[in-house]
Regions:
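Alpha-helical ds-nucleic-acid-binding substructure associated with the helix-hairpin-helix region
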Residues: 24, 28, 56-57, 61-129, ...
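Structural motif
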Residues: 37-45, 93-96, 182-189
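C-terminal accessory module of base-excision DNA glycosylases/AP lyases that mediates lesion recognition
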Residues: 1-35, 100, 117-122, 135-207
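Histidine/lysine/aspartate-rich catalytic loop segments that bind and position anionic ligands
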Residues: 108, 130, 146-150
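A general alpha-helix detector
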Residues: 46-51, 67, 84-88, 122-126, ...
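A positional/architectural concept
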Residues: 13, 20-50, 55-66, 70-72
Length: 207
């Protein structure tokens, strides 16, 4: 099981408001009507997938993830990861470091937190206490598991590339320019991020 659910309650209103205030984004959105962010109901899956995807291509990450699914007999869960040996995990293509990080997440008690009671900043702080999780991975958790509406992961190379391509003819941009766009897109930066990713990738980004 993949632990997926698909409901993002604020999606339609976000699309409407963003389309009204940003013509460039409106054109991007119009190219992908009927598509939207797919959420993961299991936060462990989001974190594990994000670890797998660190510093490698989407295609390479997808290949490793499929091997991991086979190794885990279709059940990538905290308990199943704890049962698998390091050798079994490494055979999927995971580096020793990523194997260690995924084990850390599987064993962490932080995932038992009531996230509804936490701000985005508090969630990021808690997740970053787990070795292997940094701000980017925490942001993927906020987007793909919790559907927090206003996440703009500016440490994400793909997002930076998409913004520069669509808003500055592929040329580099300053922090002030990125911050200005973030203010324009707020409070719907998550929806913006998804469509900008989608404008670059042949398949939707998923964590």
């Amino acid at each position: 099981m993949d632990g997926q659910m698909n409901v993002v309650e604020h999606w339609n209103i976000a699309v409407q408001e963003l389309s009204e205030r940003d013509k460039i984004l409106k054109n991007i959105i119009s190219n992908y009507r009927g598509e939207r962010l797919k959420l993961k109901s299991d936060g462990f899956l989001t974190l594990a997938r994000a670890i797998v995807g660190q510093q490698i291509s989407v295609k390479a990450a997808d290949t490793i993830w499929k091997r991991l699914e086979i190794t885990a007999n279709g059940n990538i869960s905290r308990s199943r990861i704890r049962e698998l040996s390091t050798e079994e995990l490494r055979k999927t293509g995971l580096s020793s470091q990523k194997t260690s990080y995924i084990r850390n997440i599987a064993e962490s008690e932080v995932l038992g937190t009531d996230w509804d009671e936490c701000s985005d900043e508090k969630i990021t702080e808690l997740l970053c206490t787990i070795k292997g999780i940094g701000k980017w991975t925490a942001e993927m958790f906020l987007i793909f598991h919790l559907a927090r509406p206003n996440v703009l992961p500016l440490a994400d190379i793909g997002l930076i590339r998409a913004i520069e391509k669509n808003y500055n003819d592929g040329n580099g941009m300053s922090k002030e320019q990125f911050d200005g766009l973030g203010q324009k897109w707020s409070p719907w930066c998550t929806v913006t991020t998804w469509y900008l990713w989608r404008s670059l990738d042949p398949i939707p980004v998923e964590y």
